[in-house]
Structure formats: C-alpha cells, structure tokens
Amino acid sequence: MPKISSRDGGRPAQRTVNPIIVTRRGKIARLESGLTPQEAQIEDLVFLRKVLNRADIPYLLIRNHKNRPVLAINIELRAGLERALAAACATEPMYAKTIDEPGLSPVLVATDGLSQLVDPRVVRLYRRRIAPGGFRYGPAFGVELQFWVYEETVIRCPVENSLSRKVLPRNEITPTNVKLYGYKWPTLDGMFAPHASDVVFDIDMVFSWVDGSDPEFRARRMAQMSQYVVGEGDDAEARIRQIDELKYALRSVNMFAPWIRRIFIATDSTPPPWLAEHPKITIVRAEDHFSDRSALPTYNSHAVESQLHHIPGLSEHFLYSNDDMFFGRPLKASMFFSPGGVTRFIEAKTRIGLGANNPARSGFENAARVNRQLLFDRFGQVITRHLEHTAVPLRKSVLIEMEREFPEEFARTAASPFRSDTDISVTNSFYHYYALMTGRAVPQEKAKVLYVDTTSYAGLRLLPKLRKHRGYDFFCLNDGSFPEVPAAQRAERVVSFLERYFPIPAPWEKIAADVSRRDFAVPRTSAPSEGA
C-alpha cells in the first residue's frame, strides 16, 4: 500500500486536550486546530477500532480502490455494532453517510444510528470537524464501514476492493495481520502488499525561496543588477517580494500531500522566523548544490533550477515548486508519477507564440523559446505550449542525462546571475518535453488548476469562491510585475485568504513545535509489513 504509516513508526500519542464541541447550522462538530484531514481520518479509524474491540465485534481492515481505509464487518453483527457505536458516540459528533444510495443526508450516530435505510451495506463514518477559517472535515475524509454477507462457501461484499471481487471464495481467503498507525490490524493476505498500481517509491519536494524583504539582500541584488540588461518585468519588485507564502505552501503539503518524504528549501536567505528545526525540512544553500561555485551569488531562478539534481540526499523522484504555488485539496502521488516512475506534467492552454528569443522579452518567454529550439534541433518536434503554474514532477537521473547532453546550456544558465535571453528553463518545460520525447513523461490531463493574478482586483475577487468551494487540485497566487492593487492591500487580502484556506499549522512551524499532537503522516519507504 502506498505511503501510509505513523511518522515515528510507533503508537501515536493520545491528545491531552478535551475537544470543544459546537453546534453549527443544526449539526454538532469538533473545533479542530491540530489535525490534518488524513490525521483526522486515522484518528477516527483508531476510535472505531477501539469501539469494535470493546464490543468484541470481529472486523477486517481493507482498502478500497482509492486507498480509503475500510472496516469490513459481518452483516449479522450490524445491530450490535450500531448499539456499541451509539453508546461510544454519545458525546461525539460522529456522523454516518450512506453510500449505497446517493443523496441521503448524513445522520448523527448517537441518535439516528447508521443510516435511514433498513439494510445499508456501505456507510462512511466521520467525526465532523471545523477548523479555523471554516474548513470542514466531512464525509470525504471518512472511514468506510462495509457489511459483508458470510455464507457457507463464499463471502459476498457490497463492492469490490483494491484486491478482490465482490464474491470471495472462503477456501481462498488467508487471514493475516498488518501493522499500521501503531496497531496490529486483522486483514487478508495481499491486501496491504504493494500492488502494481501503487506508487511506492520515495518522493521528495524542493521549494525555491528568497526573502525579498531582507534589506541587505535587496541592496546586493540592486547593485549587481545595475551591471546587467534584464528582460521585461525581470527587475520588478514581484520577482522577490514575499508575504510568507512559503509557510502556507508548506502547510498545503502537510495537509494534502503527506506522502512527501522530505522537503528541501533552496535558498541563500536567512530561514524565516516561523520555521523551526524539523527532520522533514532541510535548508539547502546554493554552494551546496551548484557545480560551479564561482557562479555565485545568483539572483536567477533559472540558474537555481538548473542545479536542483545536485542537491545532496534528494530522492530520484521529486517535485519542484515555487512558494506561490499551492495544493488545493488532497492529492495522490499518482497525480505526478505513474507506478513505474513516468512523470506527469500539466500543460497550459497558453501557446508559447511566434518569434525567437531576444533581450526585450521576459526571461520566462525567452527561456520557452530557447527550450523550443533546442528540442527541435534534437528531436525534430516543435513544442507549442507553456506549462501550468503548479508543482512539477522530476527525475534526478533524467536531469543528469540532460546536463550531459546539453552541457553548454546548463553551464551558461547556471552562470547567469540574472535571467538572460539565452537561459534554458529546466523545470518549466525543458525537462518535461525532453522526457516526453524520450518516453519518460506524459501529459496529466485530469488536474484542475487555477491561476490568480493577485495584483489585480479581478484576481482578488476570485479568492472567496476559491476558498468556499475548494474545487481545484492546484492554484497559483501570482504576484504580477505590473500591479493594479496597492502592495499593502494585496498582502492583507492574500494572507487572510491563505490563513483560512490552510488553517492547520505544520509540525515544522514554531507555533506547533511544542504542541502535543498525533504524528501520523511521514511515509514509509515501503509498504507496511503483513503478518506483523
């Protein structure tokens, strides 16, 4: 099974603070300020495990085709389970949503049982939670209960699961145990072994970041820039301005991509004051991963991106992102990689356009044209589209191969202190189309992406709807080079939005460093062991 375990591999500590229960719109809920959606789901799973054990009700832990945790129970024990849950949830905002029949509203388990149906076969249980900013943990983050019919020779399941069909011959079933979340669970042999459709390899993430508010950095940058001619918008304040977007970009990883193994922050700035030391976070200085240190210092993101594959300890498969790019909802590793490691990139509708590179264009537009010419010379195919502003998947071995094949272009870009009209843009399109043309990348056509120019009033008007519906896998809150909105007003609106969209402090924030909390989400390097 891909990327699920406790962070420390042991039994998670119990929370010491009694939950606050509130009523909102006629429904009760916990006020949640510490658990991510996945952590809350696991906490509910462990809660249900204890209820079942105390009631002496046998169960199996299985996984469905979407890797949601499922507890399978003999249908003859459903009435007893309903009574046990009603008693255990007397003071809990535990709700049950019937999956058998779409459209049925969730019911409060303590008073209304498991379903409005007389004979439900699949229900989803969850403790309703409300986080700061109004983020609600609903049935999407629930634990599924399935009621199986045990006959003399077969077991009939209401739906297929990740391993088996709806009818299980009893003579083909081999019970076993699996250790997950600090506990031993009864299951079926093969259920939690790595499946061919699983992404089981390590995936790291790299962010590039600069603290543009540092007066010394700004002075050094301006002094060196005066000696160069830069393209349209490349000298803009927006290139370096930051309002703690990195904090919320990292929160988005913690909340929605807990399968990320390690996070590297490529920066020569002083670490932000909110960042605590944490084993999952590594600050990487340019001198640690630039092949040619004589090229430093650099103020060129293209240069930094051309050297990412030299970061010590970086996994073969990794994601790269800027601090203005966010995960908008829970994502699987398969959004970025196939089980065999093929990368999946997201093309934008925007065309690169006509014309060659020239000093008057922006560095972004020039690099796309340099990429296009190099790839045409190598493969005889023309790339036509930019990529979306999202985190991108990369493979270290492919980048090493590219640097060997295009040594002059990599070296020239790494040595350019500012964006130049001869730069390549490795992470924006060069890698992805090179990998596509060599059979190691494919377009990702299912992702939902939103780009917002937060320096325009039209862009700011999109934020309330974005927060309310949370319907995008990725969104970018870009700081445009030609602003319409005053900087202070933009900062207030954007930070307010981000704080409400990502209300759960990550464990590497100083505000969370001393808080006792469950610690579930750092992935294993392999699937959990069966029979443990």
From Swiss-Prot:
Keyword annotations of the record: Exopolysaccharide synthesis, Transferase
One GO biological process term: polysaccharide biosynthetic process
Enzyme Commission (EC) number: 2.7.-.-
Gene Ontology terms, MF aspect: transferase activity, transferring phosphorus-containing groups
Annotated signal sequence range: none
RNA-binding found in the keyword field: no
GO cellular component: peptidoglycan-based cell wall
Keyword Manganese applies: no
A Pfam family annotated for this UniProt entry: Stealth_CR2
Entry-linked PANTHER family: N-ACETYLGLUCOSAMINE-1-PHOSPHOTRANSFERASE SUBUNITS ALPHA_BETA (PTHR24045:SF0), PTHR24045
Family according to the record: Belongs to the stealth family.
Note: Stealth proteins are part of a protein family that is conserved from bacteria to higher eukaryotes. Family members were first identified in microbes as proteins that help pathogens to elude the host innate immune system. Microbial stealth proteins are involved in the biosynthesis of exopolysaccharides. Stealth proteins are predicted to function as hexose-1-phosphoryltransferases.
This protein's name: Exopolysaccharide phosphotransferase CpsY
Organism expressing this protein natively: Mycobacterium tuberculosis (strain ATCC 25618 / H37Rv)
Gene this chain is encoded by: cpsY
